[in-house]
Amino acid sequence: MSTAPSPGTTPSPSPPSPPTNSTTTTPPPAASSPPPTTTPSSPPPSPSTNSTSPPPSSPLPPSLPPPSPPGSLTPPLPQPSPSAPITPSPPSPTTPSNPRSPPSPNQGPPNTPSGSTPRTPSNTKPSPPSDSSDGLSTGVVVGIAIGGVAILVILTLICLLCKKKRRRRHDDEAAYYVPPPPPSGPKAGGPYGGQQQYWQQQNASRPSDNHVVTSLPPPKPPSPPRKPPPPPPPPAFMSSSGGSDYSDLPVLPPPSPGLVLGFSKSTFTYEELSRATNGFSEANLLGQGGFGYVHKGILPSGKEVAVKQLKAGSGQGEREFQAEVEIISRVHHRHLVSLIGYCMAGVQRLLVYEFVPNNNLEFHLHGKGRPTMEWSTRLKIALGSAKGLSYLHEDCNPKIIHRDIKASNILIDFKFEAKVADFGLAKIASDTNTHVSTRVMGTFGYLAPEYAASGKLTEKSDVFSFGVVLLELITGRRPVDANNVYVDDSLVDWARPLLNRASEEGDFEGLADSKMGNEYDREEMARMVACAAACVRHSARRRPRMSQIVRALEGNVSLSDLNEGMRPGHSNVYSSYGGSTDYDTSQYNDDMIKFRKMALGTQEYGTTGEYSNPTSDYGLYPSGSSSEGQATREMEMGKIKKTGQGYSGPSL
C-alpha cells in the first residue's frame, strides 16, 4: 500500500486540524489531546497508527446497533483521569473516519486489543470520533426523550382513569335515593358506566413496555396534563339533574330517572306506589273527587307522600295527565305543592305529591266544631296563597292558569303556611293567545262569570276565584248557601254592597266574621276588603294582577292602585252595576241562578251532622258538613256532576 508514505507526510498538518474539531465538538476529547500533541513529532509510530486506524473501522458497524456502549461513553467523560483515553479509543473514535474504508473490517477485531496503539490513535483521530459520538448521543437522547414522553402520557392516562373509576364507585355507593331502585341501576351500569370501564381496561393494558417504567418517577411532576379527562363529563351529567327543570329543584339532587316527559322528577312503578299506600287501602284514603282518588303513602325512605290516582274513565285521562305533569315539572315555590314523581303503567296514571299534614283552608275555616281562626292566621294564609298564584301567573313561562282556586285546594301546614294544590285542572296559556277556550272545569261558587258562561279562560279568572276565597276569610261564610235554594244571592252578590260601604266608610260591621268579634287590625282588614272587591269585579280586564294583590296585602302599595282605569267618583265599581263590563250583568245573574238551581236542586243531602272525613286533598277530597247541606260541584260544560261520597269542594 503506497498510502503508508502519504500519511507520513501529512501527519504534521493533520494534528492542528483535529484539535480544532475536537475542541469545538466535545470538551472531554480535547482534554486528552493536549498530552499527545508532543508525540506527533516522531514519524515512526505513524505507520503503526495507519495499521491501527483501519482495524477500528470494523468496530464501527458493530458499535452502531447496540446503544449500550454510548452509555459507557458518558461515565468516562466526567473522569479527567488518564484512564479516559483508553476507554474512548476502542469503539467510537474511528466511526466517522472509517465509513469510507470498509475493506479493513476483518483485521479490526484482532488489532483493537493491541496495547501499543492507544497512544497514537488517540492523538491522530480523537476529533472525528467526538463528532460521531455526538451523533450517536443525540440520536439516543432523542429516542429516550420520545419514549419518556410516551410513557408519561400513558401513565398519566392510567392514573386519571383509576381515579375516575374510584370516584364513580363512590358516587354510585353514595346514591341515597331509595324509592326508584330500578332507575338508579341503569345509572351505574348505563351507557356511560359500561363504556368507561371498558375504556379503562383497554388503556390499562396499553402500557406493556418494561423499560419504560424506569423513567416513570421523573415524569410524574408534569402531571398538568389533567386536561385529557374530557371523558368524565358523563358522571357530571348524572350528578346534575336536575335540573331541570325545578331549577328548581336544585334543592333536590336525587337521580333523574324520569326524563320520559322531559323533566327531572322521579318515576315510580305501580307496584312501588301500591306498597307505599298499602294496596291503596281505604284506611289510607285521603279523599276522592271527579277525577280520581288521593291516598296517603310512605316511601321506603320514610317520606310521606300523597298519591293522586286518576280514574280510568275520568275526563282527565292521558291528555290531561301529561299536561299536568309537564306543568308541575316547571313549578317550584314554597307556597305551591311540589310534585315528587309520577307513574305511567298501562292505563294507570298516578301523581306523587309532597304530603301536607295539616289539612286545608276549608277544614279549618268551615269545619264543624273547629275553633275560630284568628285574623293574623287568615291574613297569613291569604298572603301565602296570593304569592303562589302570582308565581304561576307571572313568573312561569309560559304562564300557568290554575282554573280551580278554592278553599279546599289551599293546603295548610303545621305553621299555617298556605300551599296551593291541585294542578290537575291547570292549563297553560301562551303569550300569543290572550285567552284559551276550554271545557269548563271548576267548582260552583268560585267560577268567574265570563268563564262559567263561555269558557273564556284567562289568568283573571283565577283572580276572581281568589277574590271569593278572600271573602270567605273576611266573612267566614261559604261561597253558596244550599239552605236558601231560592235566594238569588251568592256570597259575591251578597257581599258587593257591604264591600262598597266598607271601602267608602271604613265600616266593617256585618261584613267581618262575627266569630272574630272586633279582634282584627282595621288597616289590614281594609286592605283585604279592597283586594276582595277588586278581584270580584265583573270586568275581567279591570281586575288587578295577582302581584298587585300581593303588594296590597303587604301594605306596600296604595289601595287606589287597585282601581287603575276606574273613573273617579264611581264607587259603585264594587256593585253589580258598575261601569261597562266585559260580561253583561243581567246575563251573569241569570246564569248564576240557573247554575245554582241545577247544583242544589239535583243533590240529595245527608243528615249525619258531622264533618265528613278530615282532609281535603289536592282538590280531590270530599269535604263538607252534611248538616249544613253543602253543595259544591264539579262543573263540566255547564253540567253539574255528583262526586259521590261527599262533595269535591266547599260550598255554602
Curated annotation (Swiss-Prot):
Carbohydrate attachment residues: 21, 50
Active-site residue list: 404 (proton acceptor)
InterPro entries the record matches: Kinase-like_dom_sf, PERK1-13-like, Prot_kinase_dom, Protein_kinase_ATP_BS, Ser-Thr/Tyr_kinase_cat_dom, Ser/Thr_kinase_AS
GO MF annotation list: ATP binding; protein kinase activity; protein serine kinase activity; protein serine/threonine kinase activity
Biased composition (Pro residues): 8-19, 26-112, 216-236
The reaction(s) this protein catalyses: L-seryl-[protein] + ATP = O-phospho-L-seryl-[protein] + ADP + H(+); L-threonyl-[protein] + ATP = O-phospho-L-threonyl-[protein] + ADP + H(+)
Protein name: Proline-rich receptor-like protein kinase PERK1
